[in-house]
Amino acid sequence: MVAQKSDEVRNDITFNKNYEESCYDSWGYYNGKIEKISDYPSFSLSSPKLEFTKAETLKSITYPTGGKSEFEYELNEYGAKVSNDHTAVNECPNSISGGLRLRSVTNRDYDGSIISSKRYKYTKDYKETKSSGISKGEMQFSIEYNIQSLGLRLNLMSAGGFLSNTTSMNTPDVGYSTVIAEDVDSLGNSLGYKKFQFTNFGTDINGVSHLDDKAWGSNVTSDKVYSCLPFTCKSAERGKILSEEVFDANGNKTEETSYRYSKTNKTDINTATQQAIIMYRSPTSTVVGLLGWLTKTPRYSYLCSKMTTKELYDNGKTYQTDKYFTYNSCNLLSTETTANPNNEIEKAIRSYTYSCDKPGTEPFAGHGIKSAILEESFTANGMSDKYAYRYGTNVYGVPFVWQYLRIYNGGTDNIEYEVTKTDKFGNPIEFVTKGTPYVQIFSDDGTHVQLFVEDATLEELCDAVGERLAYYISQCEYYNATGLIYNKRDKLTNMHMRFFNYLGSDLLFEETTKEGLRYSYIYDNSNHLIDKSLLYGNNKWQTLKMYEYNYRH
């Protein structure tokens, strides 16, 4: 059997690499149009073309089973756009923008028959035609500079448009407030759909505005509003999911989930944008216009603070679950509270403490490690369960988990896991779990377990094998240490151990027990396990398990 990996097929049209040709629309997407440098450019909006915009995009994926997923695209569309001064969202007829959006994904069987499809709509509701897309604004192709006191005027033009000098700007050309994903069976019948709503420009469904802010403190006055002038960008707030509604094939809502967000308390940074424009140059003088604006560089994060899920039943009853989230100064989850508004008894709280919550905590203070969990607790129904992690460093200064403790209902600390020795990579060589000692030795690069010994200590191993073992481990010669134990395994009568060998691709291919039982693992060329065999005393392999995959050629 020869296995095949998934194959990707991309659209046949490729980008034109000729540097003398400009084949992009005003949004920066490939449109197949040829404009030579010698031609006089058009300083206006260039229309996108779907055929060329799809250049080199993913068209289909063929799986080893012979099945296929096909992707269909369409151009972005918007039904509103942001004003040039970034202070308002104005409705407009549905219009086409550059860039692609996913229209459908069709899953086919090996014979080409349709299994299922998912269709996407970007309208405000299932039966509406009005696009929920909002364009970030019109491209600016010319800017006029005017120093009235000197009677100087300068008009700059750009065929590609002028980009804004903003900070933290990653806003797409079109953002969608609502996306509908509909599941369809092989006959084209709807199986129901999900409606997703997101934060976007303007005011969201919770009444919160995510529009950008104008600059201030400028020495520039203008009779015309230019969209490319500096502004404070709030893109960090946009694109967050606000609600997810599930509808059945009859259009009845069966479940809804809503999300609320909050800003962290980090103060924005005041940022200066400055330009120097040469208005006039002669052999004897140069006139330079100096322009400046002040904006803010946002430093806050926009994190989910509440999630509410409602299950809707045919009898009109609902079951609601609320989840509340809080975060620490590093934006890591601190608490997650789950509650039923009608049943306080069901309230459950899960909380976390990290290394950044306790500055100076060793061994992290000198390593800049902020996200290591120190404590994790769960409280519900009057009961509590707490887990505590204690860390250490080995002789090479590498941090590792030293102890794992459990405290049930405020009782005594129960050490469930404790490491007594590590290798140079911080991997545990000797540890105790719930009172049982274990020894494991990794490869010389610290990536694979070569030896695993149950119910034995490293000291007991050294006593049985000899002092050479302690020397190999102290010198980080882990391969030699494993080989020494393997050669003397017959002396270790009271220990349970297993030895492991790996292929170059990190796959386990042989496992040997102390008693001499050898297990072999065979893989296909997709790295899927196809055979596990045992070598018996007559030197013959006996297949224990076989795995077959439905590959098609």
Residue ranges and their predicted role:
Residues 1-483, 487-538:
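Non-catalytic interaction/targeting regions
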Residues 544-553:
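Outer-membrane beta-barrel "beta-signal"
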